[in-house]
């Protein structure tokens, strides 16, 4: 049985371990998943029990949305009610990679992960372990940083185990994260004009090379429209 894996079990990325991770996600458990930015606390985005476990383990406010992680641009498009032309342009340049897009969501995306908003955040991570899991698992995965809300984000499997080991039955060890900085988040106006919600690994200049008209208005939005906009966010 997969649940015989002890708390904080770290494994190399092989097909058996991807199956073990998938079984845990399917049962509503959380796991540690590496990405190029930080290690994420992963759960099945369409499993209410798993999503609730993410919020519980992290002690994350329920009004702070989560980011969907998917395997490809096509998968992201399948969850979006509208995928703006400039969103596609950005995705084609920066995916897989540390760019999160905030777009109108289809009805099957639960309010539980969007904090009741009509938009959802999505990205394709650039890490072989994360991509292997996302390609093997049928549903999108939420994976905020695997730490208590407001504390330093983990960049190694050992860091996850030290902080959350008794709460996480399995951590996929993908080595140290290449970047160690959260993704850049870009939303869109109703007209499809991109707007930076959070700067991260991708700079404003890099974004402007693809979308010269991109907006950057720090402090304009008081509402938490996307992950990373909460004043005390580093999670």
What are these regions (language model features)?
Residues 3-235:
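Active-site-adjacent structural elements in enzyme catalytic cores
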């Amino acid at each position: 049985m997969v649940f015989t894996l002890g708390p904080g079990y770290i494994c190399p990325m092989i097909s058996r371990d991807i199956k073990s991770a998938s079984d845990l996600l399917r049962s509503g458990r959380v796991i540690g998943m590496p990405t190029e930015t930080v290690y994420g606390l992963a759960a099945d985005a369409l499993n209410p029990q798993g999503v609730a476990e993410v919020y519980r383990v992290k002690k994350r406010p329920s009004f702070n949305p989560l980011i969907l992680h998917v395997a490809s641009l096509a998968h992201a498009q399948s969850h979006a009610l509208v995928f703006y032309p400039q969103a596609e342009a950005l995705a084609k340049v920066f995916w897989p990679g540390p760019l999160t897009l905030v777009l109108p969501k289809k009805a099957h995306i639960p309010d539980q992960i969007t904090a009741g908003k009509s938009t959802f955040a999505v990205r394709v991570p650039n890490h072989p372990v994360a991509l292997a899991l996302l390609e093997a698992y049928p549903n999108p995965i939420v994976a905020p940083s695997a730490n208590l809300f407001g504390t330093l984000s983990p960049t190694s499997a050992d860091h996850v185990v030290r902080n959350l080991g008794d709460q996480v039955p399995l951590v996929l060890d993908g080595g140290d994260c290449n970047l160690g900085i959260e993704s850049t988040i870009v939303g869109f106006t109703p007209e499809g004009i991109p707007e930076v919600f959070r700067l991260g690994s991708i700079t404003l200049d890099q974004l402007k090379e693809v979308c010269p008209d991109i907006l950057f208005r720090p402090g304009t939005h008081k509402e938490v429209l996307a992950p990373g906009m909460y004043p005390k966010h580093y999670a």
